[in-house]
Amino acid sequence: MVSFSSLVLAASTVAGVLATPGSEQYVELAKRQLTSSQTGTNNGYYYSFWTDGGGQVTYTNGNGGQYQVDWNNCGNFVAGKGWNPASEKAVTYSGSWQTSGNGYLSVYGWTTSPLVEFYIVESYGSYDPSTGATHLGTVESDGATYNLYKTTRTNAPSIQGTATFDQYWSVRTSHRQSGTVTTKNHFDAWRNAGLQLGNFDYMIVATEGYQSSGSATITVS
């Protein structure tokens, strides 16, 4: 994954009922659907969709802070909505998320100077993100315990191209698909563990998949 580790089944079914090729609704839906990497703004939210091009992945921007992603035998992808630049804000999200294999639902983002990729993992599939990571302790936040980890990626994709950078992880011990994440608690916990955060780039509530299939419909605020 762009990490330890990308979107048309449910959307196309609805489109078949509500919109026909050439209709205004069909054209508008097509504008919102993405199958290749792209970033931008939609309904006041920043969105980011990155895919390595493997398998079938369709990302669709919905109303407000909502997005949908469907994937089938994907390579690796990360997609979601949020903010650019990020801040130490409380992030609220809700919806449905499921995968038959390796995937994460997380508050995800980057900093620069230093270049850091960070994850606050709310739920994950068959692959435990703590595998091979250095455990740095725990933090209590939003009614749960999160385990803190650090890893290093070498010559990997990043917001600055191929680079070597650290990943910071905060992994919730009890999985969930809705709630509020007080991001400041996690940023402070990483700092207290001796990890340096740089200047905030973007932060999204992300769905990520790696060599798996699944679907997600998430609303952020």
Swiss-Prot record:
GO cellular component, one term: extracellular region
Reaction(s) this enzyme catalyzes, per UniProt: Endohydrolysis of (1->4)-beta-D-xylosidic linkages in xylans
Range of residues in the leader sequence: 1-19
EC numbers, comma separated: 3.2.1.8
Gene Ontology BP annotations: xylan catabolic process
Location within or outside the cell: Secreted
Pathway: Glycan degradation; xylan degradation
Active site annotation, chain numbering: 117 (nucleophile), 208 (proton donor)
PROSITE patterns linked to this entry: GH11_1, GH11_2, GH11_3
An example Gene Ontology molecular-function term: endo-1,4-beta-xylanase activity
Domain GH11: 33-221
InterPro entries assigned: ConA-like_dom_sf, GH11/12, GH11_AS_1, GH11_AS_2, GH11_dom, Glyco_hydro_11
Keywords (A to Z) from UniProt: Carbohydrate metabolism, Glycosidase, Hydrolase, Polysaccharide degradation, Secreted, Signal, Xylan degradation
Pfam families named among the record's database cross-references: Glyco_hydro_11
Family listed: Belongs to the glycosyl hydrolase 11 (cellulase G) family.
Function: Endo-1,4-beta-xylanase involved in the hydrolysis of xylan, a major structural heterogeneous polysaccharide found in plant biomass representing the second most abundant polysaccharide in the biosphere, after cellulose.
The protein's name in its UniProt record: Probable endo-1,4-beta-xylanase B
Organism: Aspergillus fumigatus (strain ATCC MYA-4609 / CBS 101355 / FGSC A1100 / Af293) (Neosartorya fumigata)
Gene responsible for this protein: xlnB
